[in-house]
Structures are given as structure tokens and as C-alpha cells.
């Protein structure tokens, strides 16, 4: 397809541009990400999603490069390198009224909800201008105006998202609640309690599992009967 060749040219140009000055400032200078809509087709969706994935990867690589040399970041960081596709897809599907609750690798989900990058970097550097005044850091960052919430680990986002979905249903307001978690979270009892309650009450909730097959060093098939979470 001709548009694939155009996409390749765009990737080469963008990568060359970003390599000239890889820092969090260079990421911000590229401007805010503008999501496409489900009505867009073919080339538009492919280019937009790839742009989102590439920019998120470069964002993370910039943080890796700055993390230890700068020694100014006041928090531990869990990177989402290699897991850019799911946030990119969510950026296409989610609407402003939807809630998004993240696992501990928050940057991609923060990005997917369109929250401001300046406030993300300021938060990581412990600045008062950060999304949470520099008090939350990378893992626990939230941006209430964008309806994005971090601060959950080990299936915690699942229960919180279920509560938000119940609130939406009770108030009869638009939007859905989205819970992001890894396949390791499905080993937790809280996960099964949340999905059981969501099913029983028909809550407006979407469960998004990022399956990288490992919970720290434990292979999934040594912990679970199948690697198909939906089937399980």
C-alpha cells in the first residue's frame, strides 16, 4: 500500500528529529497529542496510533536517559517500554467523560487520557507545578480534570474502577470506567470479586489486561492454567 511507504518515511523523519535532542523538553516541544476518531480510516488511524506509540516510547527513553544522570527525580519510576500499544489504542477509544484507572506503569495511560505532559514531568521531578504538586510521583500520579487516576498496584485499579462505574450507573451519567492491569493481577482475589460484582450489577466498566506473561520473574503458565485471560 502506498500509504505504508509514506508511514515509513514519516517514521524515519520523526525518529531523526527526536534523536537530535532526546530529553523531556524535546518531547514537550512536539506539542500535545491529538487523537483520531473511530470515524477515521486506514492511513489516518495507522499513522496516528503509530505516532502515539513512538512518542510514548521516546518519552520513556528520555526519562531513562535523565533518571540517574540528573538525580533530581524524587520518586521511583516504573517504565512502560514495550507496552505502548494498549495506551495508544485507548487514546482512540476513550472519551472525555470516561474514567481511566491505571496500574503502576502510569505514563502510557496518563498519555492516553490526554493529560498535560508538562504536569507529568513536573510531578516526576517533584515540582509544585506537577499534576499533584510533586507529592505523588510517577506511580501514584493522577489528573482529575482528565479523569485519570494512578496509585493502584496488584489489582487495586480493578476495584476502584468498579466503584467509579457504580457511581456512573447510580448517577445515570455518561461515560464508562476503565481498569488497566497486568495478567498477574488476575491472581488476586480482589480481581474476581470486582468482575463478579460488575457482571451482577451490569456496571459500565471495561477491563483492560496487559499480558506480558510474567509477574516479576514468574511465568504465567506456571501460575495459571491458560494464558488466555478472557477464556479463564
Enumerate the predicted regions with their spans.
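N-terminal amphipathic, basic-rich helices that act as targeting or association modules
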Residues: 11-105
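Short beta-alpha connecting loops at secondary-structure transitions
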Residues: 213-219
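Short, ordered loop/turn segments at secondary-structure junctions
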Residues: 105, 210-213
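Active-site flanking residues adjacent to catalytic metal/cofactor-binding acidic residues
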Residues: 182, 209-210
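Cofactor-binding active-site loop characterized by glycine-rich and histidine/acidic residues
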Residues: 61, 70-201, 219-226, 230
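A glycine-rich helix N-cap at a beta->alpha junction
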Residues: 201-208
